[in-house]
């Protein structure tokens, strides 16, 4: 597997907090993104993904990913497509708004990815979820003040 080595960066403004080895690459075909696009739109319409000046200092919030084959890949190399960084303000994502994470190394705080956009700031978290359960196919990271405020009444441990 090729791991790109073109662009080391850590953004300091509060979004990306990992080292990123990123290579610009063409977008995945639109036909490969129909299902992730439909789920992402549902999360956007229910305000679980979005961007508003009132929340998180105006940064976008929430993201979505889906595992890519091969599904028997070893830990830290379970590829996935993920929404690009700071795309929360967009009602619908086009292929150029998704990145592919090729590998992730938590001990080194490093993501290797490619695509037309840099991957979400939560890419390392998504990778760890896929490592915790090799059968996991999706990660949907949503933000809901309503659920958070009502967590105790729902029996959600805090």
Annotate each language-model stretch with its function.
Residues 2-158:
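Glycine-rich flexible loops
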